[in-house]
Amino acid sequence: MGKDEILSESAGTPSGAADGGRGLSARDLITTGVFTALFLVFMMVGGALFAPNPVLTFWMPAAAALLTGPVYLLLIARVPRHGPLVILGAVVGAILFATGMYWGWAAASVVLGAVADVVAGLGRFRAKPLNLLAFIIYSLSPMGSYLMLWADPGGYAAYLTGRGTEQAYMDTMARTATAWMLPAMVLAAVVCALISGLVGLRLLRRQFERAGMTA
């Protein structure tokens, strides 16, 4: 048995799971659902630290990225095939939209979830650098909301106040959104996603080493 086959089995999936030869099984869907729920929990915990404050909310994408890397990468390891990352992105997007978040974030979650699936698939979901890149790409999905504060501040504020956000909150956000804030947000999200992803890869490596082989 080759190393890739052992790696796949140690991750709890059939040895041929990453070859795209079959669709998602019931077990795969259950695993995807569990990890999607965990991802949402960690994302909300990260968001809860900053999102309620109109000055600190700009650092929410970085905080969410810092907490979700291990979950995202473990999902790829457990179900190394096309589909789970798309499902995660779609479910997260649907929940964001249903809970009153700006529609651009929901749309970005769906689109970047699909992009992440393609990127990880280039390495058959076993190439660590590509899996890490997939997570970093998806971690930028909150920017689909915040970007509109610069692109269309009036429309952005009108949409969110129409869905329950206080006008005072939006006014403070607008005053805080200086020219340097947008690139700083992107950089912080990328750096935090990189750190979180590396932690996730290290945790996976330790799991593989306990199983008697190296990742």
Regions found by a protein language model. Give the residues of each.
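Hydrophobic transmembrane alpha-helices
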Residues: 2, 17-87
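Alpha-helical transmembrane segments and their cytosolic interface
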Residues: 2-34, 38-41, 173-215
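Hydrophobic alpha-helical transmembrane segments
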Residues: 29-33, 62-66, 83-90, 103-107, ...
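Aromatic-anchored segments of alpha-helical transmembrane domains
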Residues: 36-44, 91-99, 137-146
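Short helix-perturbing small/polar motifs within transmembrane alpha-helices
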Residues: 41, 109-146, 197
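Membrane-interfacial segments
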Residues: 46-50, 54, 79, 83, ...
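Interfacial aromatic-anchored transmembrane helix boundaries in multi-pass membrane proteins
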Residues: 48-52, 56, 92-120
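Membrane-embedded alpha-helical hairpins and interfacial helices in multi-pass inner-membrane proteins
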Residues: 57, 132-206
